[in-house]
Every structure is written in structure tokens, then in C-alpha cells.
């Protein structure tokens, strides 16, 4: 799960980059949607995924491009299928400008991309899913807000995870 991945990020390494960047541009660079005839009516069980993140650094231009990829698989509840009834995926390119790159390592950029890159792209992913479900003619899905929790916060770990994405969609276990 995405929250588990975030717990392995060295936030201190990400902060060093975060203090020096400004988000300059966000673009969708790759997307796909698939709708089966069975997928037009909910409610749905939904699985959200975040794939690997590509990080590109241009030292001359002092830019950092973070490319997070997200996907969603939706299964009509009680349809008993192994494959999703509809799928949505997108890769975003987040371009950041940097004040300077002094003393920044590849580990700093990786940590930043996996923490801030996902966090900054998440609202665009939410809007993309909302828009695509409307265009596909299925009940719109509202992706939950992205919450960062401290990696060693025992109190936060005790809180129950929200299982509902919205009234017409459930998060698949």
C-alpha cells in the first residue's frame, strides 16, 4: 500500500530538496482508460495503486522532473470477476525549479520524489479520476485526500483506515 511505501522514505533527505524547490508545471504525460460493458453501473470495489516514480534532474537548467504513475481498478460489487470492470491510469510530470543543487545527492532527490512528488500530484490524480469517470459515463468516483503520517506515529497507526472511497465505490481489500 502507498502509505506503507511512504513509511520507508527518509523525510529528512526529502526536506533538504523541498526547501529549495518551487513547483513550476504539472502535466499529464500518459493516460489510459478501459471500460467494459459490465462496468457502467456501480457500486464498485476500488483498488488504488501507485507505481514506481521516475526522477529526472537537469543540473544546467536547475530543474527536477518527478513522474509519478497512478492506477485505479474498479470492480462492480457482486459481479464476481477476476479482471476489473473499468480501469484508469495516468502518469504526471511535475517540473520543479531549484534554487541550487549544492550538496544534494541522488538519495535526496529520490526521497523528495517519493514524498513530495506523490503529495503534489495527488490532487491532479483525484481530479483526473473524477473527470474520466464522468466522461466514461460511470458514477463519479471521489478519490480520498492524501494524508501524510509520520513514519513512527504509533497513535496514527491505531486509527482505522477509511474503507469507503465514496457512496458508490468501496476500496478493495
Tell me what each language-model feature is.
Residues 1-120, 127-173:
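N-terminal intrinsically disordered, cationic/polar leader segments
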Amino acid at each position: 500500500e502507498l502509505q506503507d511505501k511512504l513509511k520507508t522514505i527518509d523525510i529528512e533527505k526529502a526536506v533538504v530538496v523541498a526547501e529549495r524547490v518551487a513547483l513550476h508545471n504539472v502535466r499529464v504525460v500518459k493516460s489510459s482508460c478501459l471500460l467494459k460493458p459490465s462496468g457502467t453501473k456501480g457500486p464498485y470495489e476500488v483498488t488504488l495503486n501507485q507505481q514506481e516514480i521516475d526522477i529526472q534532474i537537469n543540473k544546467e537548467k536547475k530543474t527536477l522532473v518527478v513522474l509519478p504513475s497512478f492506477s485505479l481498478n474498479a470492480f462492480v460489487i457482486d459481479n464476481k470477476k477476476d479482471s476489473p470492470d473499468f480501469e484508469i491510469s495516468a502518469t504526471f510530470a511535475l517540473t520543479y525549479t531549484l534554487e541550487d543543487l549544492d550538496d544534494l545527492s541522488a538519495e535526496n532527490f529520490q526521497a523528495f520524489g517519493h514524498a513530495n512528488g506523490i503529495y503534489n500530484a495527488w490532487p491532479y490524480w483525484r481530479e483526473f479520476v473524477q473527470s474520466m469517470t464522468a466522461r466514461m459515463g460511470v458514477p463519479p468516483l471521489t478519490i480520498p485526500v492524501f494524508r501524510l503520517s509520520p513514519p513512527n506515529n504509533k497513535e496514527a497507526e491505531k486509527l482505522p483506515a477509511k474503507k469507503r472511497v465514496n457512496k458508490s465505490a468501496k476500496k478493495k481489500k
